[in-house]
A protein has these predicted regions:
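Glycine-rich phosphate-binding loop of ATP-dependent small-molecule kinases
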Residues: 1-199
Length: 199
């Protein structure tokens, strides 16, 4: 099974991605986690990523594409994967399509978590304070929300046109969101998609 999870910063993608990955026994691949892990590295690429993330902008397509493509070739992705934080732009959609086509794979479903913008700001400020995440400052949050609206939101239209978009209300308790998410995926599976349940 090949899944994407999308939504604005603070929508709870990471939390839900872990639950989805466990349920379907596939790896959850987060570009954000991969890039944050580069903070402790002293390479030119790591320094570039650190500066970009501190400003609230996204890492350039070419760098992100290379990291994701290499990760999707790993053995644990043979049964499928859940991508969190990729693709973010239309060129990345095209790149991912090409990578998947080479392996005769396709996206089965794109999960979109919808959350009120005011709720998102509160979530991110709380997360930044408790987790010590430097990229969760008010300025960076505003920048990421604008970038999401300008660049990432149009991807939902692409996946909606392809018939693979599964929209889920991301407001509320984590367990309630998870329940809605699996109900939506089960409904999609019942409509003849390629989704197959896990544990």
């Amino acid at each position: 099974m090949h899944l994407l999870i999308m939504g604005p910063p603070g929508a709870g993608k990471g939390t839900q991605a872990v639950r989805i990955a466990e349920h379907y026994q596939i790896p959850a691949i987060s570009t954000g986690d991969m890039f944050r892990a580069m903070r402790g590295q002293d390479t030119p690429l790591a320094k570039q990523v650190q500066e970009i993330m501190a400003s609230g902008a996204y890492v350039p397509n070419d760098v992100t594409n290379q990291v994701v493509a290499e990760r999707l070739l790993a053995d644990d992705c043979a049964r499928g994967f859940l991508l969190d934080g990729y693709p973010r732009t239309l060129p990345q959609v095209d790149y991912l399509d090409g990578v998947l086509d080479e392996g005769a794979r396709a996206i089965d479903a794109v999960i979109s978590l919808a959350v009120d913008p005011d709720e998102l700001v509160g979530r991110l400020l709380k997360r930044g304070a408790s987790a010590g995440r430097e990229d969760d400052t008010p300025e960076a949050i505003r920048t990421r929300q604008k970038v999401y609206v300008d660049e990432t939101a149009p991807l939902l239209d692409v996946y909606r046109q392809r018939g693979v978009l599964v929209e889920v209300d991301g407001l509320g308790e984590v367990d309630a969101v998870t329940k809605r998410l699996f109900a939506a995926l089960d409904e999609r599976a019942g409509s003849g998609s390629a989704l197959v349940g896990g544990s």
